Amino acid sequence: MDNFLALTLSGTTPRVTQGKGAGFRWRWLGHGLLELTPDAPVDRALILSAGIHGNETAPVEMLDKLLSALYSGSLTLTWRVLVVLGNPQALAAGIRYCHSDMNRMFGGRWQSFAESDETRRARELELSLETFFSSGQARVRWHLDLHTAIRGSHHLRFGVLPQRDRPWETDFLAWLGAAGLEALVFHQAPGGTFTHFSSEHFGALSCTLELGKALPFGQNDLTQFSITSQALSALLSGVEMSTSSSPPLRYRVVSQITRHSDKFTLYMDAQTLNFTAFAKGTLLAEEGDKRVTVTHDVEYVLFPNPSVACGLRAGLMLERLP
């Protein structure tokens, strides 16, 4: 199965759907779904996902290179792994999504969207994770969902962590720092993301990794993510990474800007970078007679997007943690 990406993009079913790699067994579970199981017993399970948005291709290329290293035997596998290419149709078309944003649909929220390929795929991925986690006895469960951002950022690589009732494990946060993430953003409320679903339903330590800017296949400079690729290789092979000398900055979400109607105006232009700072009292958005302003001394914007569909998030506002 050294042509997983090509098969996924073409929508082709392989003639052989299971086999042996170098020290592991593989099973093709469907388009964009590949299970890898080491020959030796392990108690660690990992979801490695990318391509939830079809125009975010750099992480897909990174996973393709990792799979090539595993199949060639140059990389040893020490986790049960489910590789997920989230939205094959959008990936093949080179667009963010075909109908609706899948990363708002998980945890059953797909039921509130008009039926589409994305709603069906979100349901399929939920079932795939349920099957994967229930079929093993993993003591450790991780989910790394790899993305790229629509716009530039003051932090080239950063992580977004779902709301979680229990404290985050230090080795997980340390690995994120070793993977080159410059900042970590902690959600304070549930959401429809893939990582919130895996964390809430299966107790996984989950993080959305944002790696640079969205570009078409073949136009990505993967060298700027070499530290993340090296960390993923070390993780898969069970090699401990040295901790970062400068730990990631930490932020928490303090509010969400939501577009409710066509009267919505976001006062940020296309050049506004993720993590741009705004002073207390700054007008961020208006919608009819409702005004959204900065309420803390300093807040930082994340994922500003004035053109989202009505009812969806047009941005997050953050505060720095000590």
Swiss-Prot record:
Residues forming the catalytic site: 210
Q: Which parts of the sequence bind Zn(2+)?
A: 53, 56, 147
Q: Which superkingdom?
A: Bacteria
What GO terms in the biological process aspect are recorded for it?
arginine catabolic process to glutamate; arginine catabolic process to succinate
Alphabetic keyword roster: Arginine metabolism, Hydrolase, Metal-binding, Zinc
Q: Name one Pfam family in it.
A: AstE_AspA_cat
Mind telling me which Gene3D superfamilies this protein's record contains? Zn peptidases
The keyword Iron is assigned to this record? no
User: What name appears for this protein in its UniProt entry?
Assistant: Succinylglutamate desuccinylase
Q: Lineage, please?
A: Bacteria, Pseudomonadati, Pseudomonadota, Gammaproteobacteria, Enterobacterales
Give the gene name.
astE
